[in-house]
Amino acid sequence: MIMTSLVFAMALNMATMKGDPMDEARKAFNNCLIKEHNEAVKAKKGASEFNEVIQKACPTERQTYFDILVKSEKGFGSKQAEAEKYANEEIQMMIDGTTSAFGENASTGGQLAEEK
């Protein structure tokens, strides 16, 4: 429950940056992950099956967010490899948060709410 609260707190904090292309890409990716989570909970998928699915989910949204993160990091002076590493870490953090939420919600049928 604490991890779910943390994920939502981060999402709410980031939601204040409306109109920002990076935030829009992040939100699109996050909402796609949430849809995958909710569908998996409804379908009563197991944890290993969900983990396999979520690692590959939302390829278009993931790539868009990745590209924007890399561009932003390079704008701060990061080298390509550093920027890509950072982008991959940020994306994996979102996936891990969704996976953690699934672990909490799978047995109770709990659903996540998409960001507006």
Summary of predicted features, one role per range:
Residues 51-116:
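Compact alpha-helical subdomains of small soluble proteins
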Residues 22-68:
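Short N-proximal segments of mature Sec-exported proteins
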Residues 1-16:
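Classic N-terminal secretory signal peptides
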Residues 12-13, 38, 74:
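General secondary-structure edge motif
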